[in-house]
Amino acid sequence: MIERLLRVIPVRLSKGPVAPAASPSRPRLLWQDPEYEVELFEQLGPERADCEARMLAAGLPLPVQHRTEWAIVHPTRRLWFVAVKAAGAGYQAGFAVDVSRSRAMPGHVLFSVEKFGAALSDGARAAGLRALAHLGRSRARVLRVHVDVYAQDRAIRERVGTLLQELGFRSAAQSRTYRDTVLVDLAPDEDGILATFRRSTRRNIRQIAEQPFEVRTIARPAPVGRLEALLGESLARTGGPPHHEDWNGVTALSDRCPELSRLTGLFRTDAQGPEALVAFAWGLNHGDYVDNPATGMTRLPRSRTPFTYALIWDLIRWAKRAGARWFDFGGVTMGHLREGDPLGGISDFKRGFSNTIVAVGEEWTLEPNPLRGQLAAALSSASSYVSRRLRAVAQAMPIRNTSPV
């Protein structure tokens, strides 16, 4: 069955269990064919760091989520690394696999790959995907393998999608990330970039400098409560889904690797304490582009100042200095606020910086063990139903007023 699915390029599956590595941080041979060897790093260590350094030196852009630095600041997560090596040509591709526990079925795990797409050759990209499918199928307790594809090149997305279908993946029923986004071209100088923005966007950026606010980076210790409050307030206004982030990890990464991560905030100069922070924006540098995973802000009484314009401009300038080619706003809808799109307001805001809207993402899932996957889905659905019923009962129960008179 597996050999039939992998008919695109003849391959040789590893026979029997993989031999134990001499050191926990050394890679294991996961996959091999006549042209490529695929290694699996299950632990951090100098071997993985050296592998990543070789990829970067060869010109391969590694998204931040695939880097050792990301794994270091997220010590509670299991982040493996898959490295593809071409015979006589060195490393050609690499990506991290997030291994998380299933809440529906204890003892089982889920594999997830973010921002898959970067590679020095199509063959290396394909070998990595074959190895990933083999990894999922070779371990009985893997319920699902999720691949988030990111590529501005439509041809790459199509080739990846075709291969994933041949490997048994299906287009994800529920989206976790974005398909379309707004891109700002960072080729011009700063004045040239600014000139491409809408007039109202440029005006809103300048307004901040005329008022009692300042833009500066947010350092450790992270003001976790304030960041969550600002993000929650923004999501409540737009109707966006809940977003949970490890802000201590974000600030640790920003302090440790300021060229990879930047958490910038807008602070009132006439206030002190946590409430002085009125907005924030986070940027991640993936090599050839920077994206904006999260932004949050509050609204002040009697103030119409658009806080986040200055923060996005700060991230764009940082991206330009870091050598990125594009700034990615992290998703956009095609609707507008006036049309009733709940996310239309934020999408209109993003389009004020650029009219370049492109498709970049696709999502695919594989259930290596379909029966276990169906059971997990049924258990998850039943758990959600019970939780909804309990909340409904709790809301219907009369509440006795115990406050003092």
Each model region followed by its residue ranges:
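The substrate-binding groove and active-site-proximal loops of carbohydrate-active enzymes
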Residues: 114-120, 302
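Aromatic (often tryptophan-rich) hydrophobic motifs at membrane interfaces
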Residues: 108, 126-137, 260-370
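Acidic-and-aromatic substrate-binding clefts and catalytic sites of carbohydrate-active enzymes
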Residues: 120-123, 151-156, 223, 335-342
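Non-catalytic accessory segments adjacent to catalytic cores
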Residues: 123-181
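A structural signal for short, well-ordered beta-strand segments and their strand-loop junctions
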Residues: 143-148, 216-219, 265, 326-329
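Short strand-loop junctions, especially beta-strand C-caps/beta-turns
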Residues: 116-118, 147-150, 218, 295-297, ...
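Active-site/acyl-donor-binding loops of N-acyltransferases
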Residues: 2-45, 99-105, 164-191, 325-405
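A conserved beta-strand-loop-helix scaffold within acyl/acetyltransferase catalytic domains
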Residues: 27-105, 151-153, 166-175, 179, ...
